[in-house]
Regions:
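Conserved nucleotide-binding/hydrolysis micro-motifs of P-loop NTPases
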Residues: 32-36, 67-69, 101-104, 124-127, ...
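Flexible beta-alpha connector loops of hexameric P-loop NTPases
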Residues: 35-40, 70-74, 133-137, 178, ...
């Protein structure tokens, strides 16, 4: 690679956005559209702050604006942009993170006003978190493919970023010839990564076929709802179960033997898989890249849709998961709705009668439901029996 091109590929390393020298400070930006509910923006920015924390930065301030449509030039209005500039200076921020995907021209226009800080959008932030959390060859390849595809149309803009980085990474951007050369390199890289993923998927398909004698059940749900904790509980495994967004990227499969409570001595062996969590505004490129991982969901005999019932936005999270299942071709799978963290929900709503709450969701969803707490081990026996009954339908 040419020298300038090597500098570009530093963008594909996990530590591009965040360094280990200090905790970087961030200002978050969100837009409230006319169709949004009153408290929706707060929930959205709470989630963005959680993503920011997961990535290793500290949120110093938030800036919001009510807009019918985002400004095509700078996403937020001119007055708000000046207000953002002031916030960045007051808090000595290193990052500005928008809760939407920005176009290359929007980032360039914002940079003309907000100088000497990194301007990130939601997609860039999520890609960086995925890059840090990828452990297997498959996950690393999937993330790198998504990064390359995301960066390709933004290459000119990213050279602007590089020219601003402290530490002397490039004092000025390359000429048109260098950028075209680098575009060819990235396109070639995308082709190679796709070929590598196809090979990995062929190997995975063979492995799944070899496991075809057992029923396959996949855990699905929004990120950080407790899927890995439930996986550990059912399989007696020791997977990473952190209170962080996207702690699990790789699809992990464990053999689990359930006992049918209706008949003494009857056991039901299953293969249980834990999958990457979904999230609002998950970059389309990531969904495309992770389709091979999500094959565990598409080919499963049944799904356990895990929901954090203690989250005030859990109904919208449920809808997003259902939409994603529709997009990957898994919406008609037999599904058990697993309302997790019921202990926290009951602490928040002490007057709730749990049996009535369960009945209301049963009538709403026309699907089996169960209320559990994986951490407190509440109603686990009933949960296991619901899985058995789901598979016997």
């Amino acid at each position: 690679l040419c020298f300038d091109c090597k500098k570009y590929f530093q963008l594909l390393k996990p530590d591009y956005f965040y360094n280990n020298v200090k905790t970087e400070k961030a200002v978050l930006v969100g837009v409230h559209r006319k169709d949004d509910k009153e408290n929706r923006l707060k929930d959205y920015l709470d989630e963005l702050e959680a993503l920011t924390t997961t990535a290793g930065a500290k949120t110093m301030a938030r800036l919001t604006q009510n807009l019918e449509y985002p400004d095509p030039r700078t996403f937020i209005g001119e007055g708000k942009l000046n207000e953002l500039e002031t916030l960045v200076k007051v808090h000595e921020a290193d990052l500005v993170i928008f809760d939407d995907e920005l176009s290359p021209s929007q980032i360039r226009n914002i940079e003309r006003v907000i100088k000497e800080v990194k301007i990130l959008d939601r997609s860039m932030l999520i890609l960086d978190i995925f890059s840090k959390n990828a452990k297997t060859a498959q996950a690393k390849t999937q993330v790198e493919l998504a990064q390359n595809q995301y960066m390709l149309p933004r290459l000119t803009k990213m050279w602007t970023h590089l020219s601003k980085q402290k530490g002397g990474i490039g004092m000025k951007g390359p000429g048109e010839t260098e950028i075209e050369t680098d575009r060819r390199v990235i396109r070639s890289n995308i082709t190679k990564l796709k070929e590598r993923l196809e090979l990995i998927e062929k190997q995975n398909t063979v492995q799944r076929q070899n496991r075809s004698d057992k029923k396959r059940v996949a855990l699905v749900g929004y990120t950080n709802v407790g899927k890995s904790t439930i996986m550990n509980l059912l399989s007696n495994a020791d997977l990473l179960a952190e209170n962080k967004l996207f702690a699990t990227l790789d699809s992990t499969v464990r053999k689990v033997v359930l006992e049918d409570q209706r008949y003494e001595g009857v056991h039901v062996p299953i293969l249980l898989s834990d999958t990457v969590g979904f999230i609002r505004k998950l970059p389309t490129l990531l969904i495309e890249s992770f389709k091979s991982t999500l094959a565990e969901v598409v080919e499963a005999d049944a799904l356990l849709h895990v929901i954090d019932v203690s989250n005030s936005d859990f109904e919208n999270q449920m809808m997003l998961v259902k939409q994603t299942l529709f997009e990957i071709g898994a919406k008609d799978k037999p599904t058990l709705l697993v309302f997790n963290k019921v202990d926290q929900y009951m602490a928040q709503h002490p007057d709730t009668v749990l049996t009535e709450f369960e009945k209301s969701w049963l009538s709403k969803e026309h699907a089996p439901v169960v209320f559990v707490s994986a951490t407190e081990k509440i109603n686990i026996t009933g949960f296991k029996q619901k899985i058995v009954e789901l598979l016997n339908k």
